[in-house]
């Protein structure tokens, strides 16, 4: 994710994250650990960072569109995010974002401020495989 030249999907992803959390901002995940932010390498630092690793892997499996640029449809039903639309690629991107938002919520207790604005150069371990 990159804030410069922000496109549609980043805003949607931010809204999904914020919808699943109370008083916790999407921006706390930018440049967190080894995988939250643009790119990624090494071993995820904690469960929160692993959410980003899994999200990156999910995006890598999406075929037929650019996950970081597309806009998809979704709604909230009884407190749950529901991905909509007929396009399989857009639904897949939405599902990646939905699962990540839930993962962040479920792992809020692992969030460690020492990994905020973490340098990718400190992620020297061998990268995990998707």
UniProtKB/Swiss-Prot annotation:
Ca(2+) binds at residues 35, 37, 39, 56. It comes from the Eukaryota. Binds 1 Ca(2+) ion. Disulfide bonds join 34-123, 36-52, 51-103, 57-130, 58-96, 65-89, 83-94. It catalyses: a 1,2-diacyl-sn-glycero-3-phosphocholine + H2O = a 1-acyl-sn-glycero-3-phosphocholine + a fatty acid + H(+). It is an enzyme of class 3 (hydrolase). Expressed by the venom gland. Residues 1-8 form the signal peptide. Its EC number is 3.1.1.4. GO terms for cellular component: extracellular region. Heterodimer of an acidic protein having phospholipase A2 activity (B chain) and an A chain which weakly inhibits the B chain enzymatic activity but potentiates its lethal potency. Negative results: does not provoke hemorrhage. Monomer: Snake venom phospholipase A2 (PLA2) that shows a high PLA2 activity (2110 umol/min/mg). This is Acidic phospholipase A2 daboiatoxin B chain. It comes from Daboia siamensis (Eastern Russel's viper). The lineage of its organism: Eukaryota, Metazoa, Chordata, Craniata, Vertebrata.
């Amino acid at each position: 994710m990159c804030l410069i030249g922000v496109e549609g999907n980043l805003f949607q992803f931010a809204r999904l994250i914020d919808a699943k959390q109370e008083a916790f901002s999407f921006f706390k995940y930018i440049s967190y650990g080894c995988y939250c932010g643009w790119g990624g390498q090494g071993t995820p630092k904690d469960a929160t960072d692993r959410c980003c690793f899994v999200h990156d892997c999910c995006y890598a499996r999406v075929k037929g569109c650019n996950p970081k640029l597309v806009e998809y449809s979704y709604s909230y039903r009884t407190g749950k995010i529901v991905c909509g639309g007929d396009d399989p690629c857009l639904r897949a991107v939405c599902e990646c974002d939905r699962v990540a938002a839930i993962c962040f919520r479920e792992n809020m207790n692992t969030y460690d401020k020492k990994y905020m604005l973490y340098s990718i150069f400190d992620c020297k371990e061998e990268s995990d495989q998707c």
